[in-house]
């Protein structure tokens, strides 16, 4: 049975897929209770973001169009975006409290906004700089996650720098592989 047979129209399919995406992100984008954050948590968040970006890449590719054509989805998305940015700020505060990042509230706010912009526009960016826009891969998505981690570079504490550097190395994809 085709997925379209279970839904009234394309908007209903998109709404269901967005609900799945929203649920997936809400499940992992939260600060753990009762313990300090670690660099391993940073790895977890970045890998979870990568998996979500890859699995739901089509949502990000056509996001503006999808939101322009569906008022209810646009309202849900705005609430989701606000929740995500609030959760991300709390997570960054946790990394600062754990002496992994040295940041104040203004820096956290700027990093949250810049990270959100990268995450939500990365697929669209890839489609504009590649000769074959449909030629997306998980490796290319990993570079988007790398970009977020790179933004944090100036805030990484000396004690966390070796572990964060190792993570950067693991996530790095050469720009020559991104822009084709």
Which residue stretches match the model-derived regions?
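Residues within the DNA-recognition helix of helix-turn-helix
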Residues: 6
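Amphipathic alpha-helical segments enriched in hydrophobic/aromatic and basic residues
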Residues: 10-21
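Hydrophobic alpha-helical connector segments
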Residues: 16, 30-59, 75
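C-terminal peripheral helix-coil segments that are non-catalytic and often amphipathic
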Residues: 124, 128-180
């Amino acid at each position: 049975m085709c997925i379209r047979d279970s839904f009234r129209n394309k908007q209903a399919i998109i709404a269901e897929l967005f609900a799945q995406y929203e649920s997936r992100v809400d499940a992992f984008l939260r600060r753990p209770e009762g313990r300090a954050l670690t660099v391993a948590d940073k790895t977890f968040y970045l890998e979870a973001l990568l998996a979500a970006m890859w699995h739901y890449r089509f949502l990000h590719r056509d996001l503006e169009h999808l939101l322009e054509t569906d008022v209810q989805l646009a309202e849900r998305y705005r609430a989701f975006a606000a929740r995500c940015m609030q959760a991300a700020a709390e997570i960054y505060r946790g990394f600062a409290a754990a002496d992994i990042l040295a940041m104040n509230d203004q820096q956290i706010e700027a990093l949250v906004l810049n990270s959100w912009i990268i995450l939500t526009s990365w697929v669209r960016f890839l489609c504009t700089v590649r000769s074959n826009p449909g030629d997306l891969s998980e490796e290319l998505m990993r570079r988007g996650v790398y970009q977020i981690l790179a933004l944090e570079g100036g805030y990484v504490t000396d004690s966390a720098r070796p572990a964060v550097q190792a993570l950067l190395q693991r996530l790095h994809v050469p720009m020559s592989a991104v822009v084709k």
